[in-house]
A protein has these predicted regions:
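Secondary-structure boundary elements
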Residues: 41-45, 49-174, 210
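Cysteine-centered nucleophilic/redox motifs
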Residues: 145, 174-200, 215
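Bacterial signal peptide processing site
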Residues: 17-19
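C-terminal motif of bacterial Sec signal peptides marking the signal peptidase cleavage site
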Residues: 13-15
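His-Asp-centered catalytic microenvironments across diverse enzyme cores
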Residues: 158-159, 192, 203-208, 213, ...
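Structured interaction patches on ligand/partner-binding surfaces of diverse proteins
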Residues: 369-394
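A eukaryotic "domain-start" boundary segment
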Residues: 21-37, 41-44
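Positively charged n-region of N-terminal signal peptides that target proteins for export
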Residues: 1-4
């Protein structure tokens, strides 16, 4: 009897000494991840030192983190990240209500893409914890963070930023960032407040007009999109008409969302085109369906009308197809951008006109750079009937 008890105790100690407190499903994954890691012993010790209630989260990161992070990332950053993620889960009812799979993959991760690994969680936990205090649910918390982030971190969009994929600390030091850096800030701010968020974007719009990055949030079992400069509502940012034309399965033009856990695909990063270390999933179909539904609803309601825009060389050459010029055009209503696109060039069909679906009874400004590189504006009042607006490069 004593021998049996001794054997059982010994087996229990071995199990605890290996990955105690970690669900068994992680054990072979941890073995594989740590097999050729130069600091495997340190990571095992870190896992063992992690509070038992947080150990699955630490295991999740160790298993799925990029190899470079596993080999070099500061252990105190890992420890801190896990601690504050679970602290948010204990504090916020909307985080407590999340499925484990969403918490682990969309709240817990320490990075949005491949940015420098910063110690952002303690600072953002304090900053945005104040903003969500008193919020009753996830939607209220999301709105509180999204509307306050610009004032809270004091970072604005600026092409003079040092690099594309800036970390929160890098962007806050410069007070400027690209749309990528701004999206990293928002993802991290939302995660700090226990709100599931992930980085999303496209390498290039369907018309090769440029790339863009934004943020997706998980609410009531579905993904919705927003961005750093808070749009009027979820799934209502200016870029939906472009994202809604993204060709599914096209690595150069599809819309992708980042996943910390492998998906079988990767997130294409225009600032690091050869990298495959950031996992991703093609979400183009959702944007196409959403845009088609929006167009159908607006046309049925009679609140919007189609507005075309053509670009010609100058007023003397504005008749033939050969006179047309391909140019990037953005449309605004006041300070709010409503959309953008690229006009048809001389070799495209004359019926190929850049089109926008705009609300009736408002004045819109179309902005583009002329042949001299100067910002040019064309203003048009949109009534109840379709209209075509013309711009000139010279």
């Amino acid at each position: 009897m004593k021998r049996t008890l001794f054997l059982l105790l010994a087996l229990g100690l071995c199990a605890c000494g290996r990955y105690g407190g970690v669900p068994a499903a992680y054990h072979p994954l941890l073995d594989a991840a740590l097999a050729d890691c130069p600091r495997a012993d340190s990571l095992r010790a870190l896992l063992h030192e992690t509070p038992r209630a947080e150990r699955e989260g630490m295991a999740y990161l160790l298993v799925w983190m990029p190899r470079g992070d596993r080999d070099t990332m500061r252990l105190d950053l890992l420890r801190e990240n896990v601690a504050y993620a679970y602290r948010a889960r204990a504090e916020y009812p909307w985080t407590q209500a999340l499925p484990d799979s969403i918490f682990l993959n969309e709240v817990l991760p320490y990075a949005a893409v491949d940015e420098v690994r910063d110690s952002w969680r303690p600072d953002f936990y304090a900053r945005f914890g104040r903003r969500v205090a008193g919020c009753r649910d996830l939607r209220e918390a999301l709105d509180a963070v999204n509307r306050s982030i610009v004032a809270e971190v004091e970072v604005e969009y600026n092409t003079a930023r040092e690099k594309t994929n800036q970390s929160p600390a890098e962007s806050m030091r410069q007070h400027m960032a690209s749309c990528t850096g701004l999206s990293v800030l928002l993802v991290d701010a939302l995660r700090a407040a226990g709100i599931p968020a992930r980085f999303a974007g496209t390498p290039a719009w369907h018309d090769d007009r440029g790339n863009h990055s934004w943020v997706e949030v998980w609410i009531d079992g579905e993904w919705h999109f927003t961005e750093y400069y808070c749009p009027p509502a979820l799934d209502a940012a200016w870029f939906l008409p472009d994202a809604g034309r993204a060709p599914e399965g096209d690595p150069a033009h599809a819309v992708y969302a980042v996943s910390f856990r492998p998906t079988g695909g990767y997130f294409p990063m225009v600032w690091s085109e050869r990298s495959r270390e950031v996992h991703g999933v093609d979400v183009s179909r959702r944007y196409r369906d959403l845009y088609a539904s929006q167009v159908e609803e607006r046309l049925a309601a009679g609140t919007h009308v189609e507005v075309g825009f053509r670009m010609f060389r100058d007023r003397r050459h504005a008749v033939q197809s050969a006179d047309r010029v391909a140019a990037n055009v953005d449309v605004f209503c006041g300070d709010e951008q409503m959309g953008g696109g690229r006009t048809a060039g001389p070799r495209q069909d004359m019926n190929d006109v850049l089109r926008f679906l705009l609300e009736k009874g408002k004045t819109y400004t179309f902005r583009y750079e002329n042949a001299r590189g100067e910002l040019t504006e064309v203003t048009a009042e949109v009534g109840g009937e379709p209209v075509t607006v013309t711009g000139y490069m010279e």
